[in-house]
């Protein structure tokens, strides 16, 4: 579960390394985000000559969370770290590569471009 002030890793090659959630989108009282949800992030750490720079405010899709993800068949998956992929205003990824596995739940939330770029879908 991701809430305001949560730090996340960036799972793409946009140039950002760490981001902080500053808003969970989807309602005025919404507190938590999970896999597939869109959040607003501030870039806290970035590499030189990347597509984004420190201090930029962007949208991101949460792709991995430490909290258990329960599936309809009763199975549970869990990741070691929280991670997100930066997106633009048209909901397309800013980077051209995705690092690490992503869960199938992104397919239900219509993030097919992220699914197709990912090296592994769990």
Curated annotation (Swiss-Prot):
InterPro entries per UniProt: Ribosomal_uL14 (IPR000218), Ribosomal_uL14_bac-type (IPR005745), Ribosomal_uL14_CS (IPR019972), Ribosomal_uL14_sf (IPR036853)
Keyword Nuclease: no
Annotated SMART domains: Ribosomal_L14 (SM01374)
Keywords: Ribonucleoprotein, Ribosomal protein, RNA-binding, rRNA-binding
GO cellular component term, pick one: cytosolic large ribosomal subunit
Biological process annotations from GO: translation
GO MF term list: large ribosomal subunit rRNA binding; structural constituent of ribosome
Assembly and interaction partners: Part of the 50S ribosomal subunit. Forms a cluster with proteins L3 and L19. In the 70S ribosome, L14 and L19 interact and together make contacts with the 16S rRNA in bridges B5 and B8.
Family: Belongs to the universal ribosomal protein uL14 family.
NCBIfam families: rplN_bact
Function: Binds to 23S rRNA. Forms part of two intersubunit bridges in the 70S ribosome.
Name under which the protein is recorded: Large ribosomal subunit protein uL14
Organism: Nitrobacter winogradskyi (strain ATCC 25391 / DSM 10237 / CIP 104748 / NCIMB 11846 / Nb-255)
Gene: rplN
């Amino acid at each position: 579960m991701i809430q305001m002030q949560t730090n996340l890793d960036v799972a793409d090659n946009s140039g950002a390394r760490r981001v902080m959630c500053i808003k969970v989108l989807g309602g005025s009282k919404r507190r938590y985000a999970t896999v597939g949800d869109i959040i607003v992030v501030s870039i806290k750490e970035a590499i030189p000559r990347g597509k984004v720079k420190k201090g930029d405010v962007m949208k991101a899709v949460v792709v991995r969370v430490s909290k258990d993800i329960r599936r309809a068949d009763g199975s549970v998956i869990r990741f070691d770290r929280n991670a997100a992929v930066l997106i633009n205003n048209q909901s397309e990824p800013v980077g051209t590569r995705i690092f690490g596995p992503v869960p199938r739940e992104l397919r239900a939330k219509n993030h097919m471009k992220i699914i197709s770029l990912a090296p592994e879908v769990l």
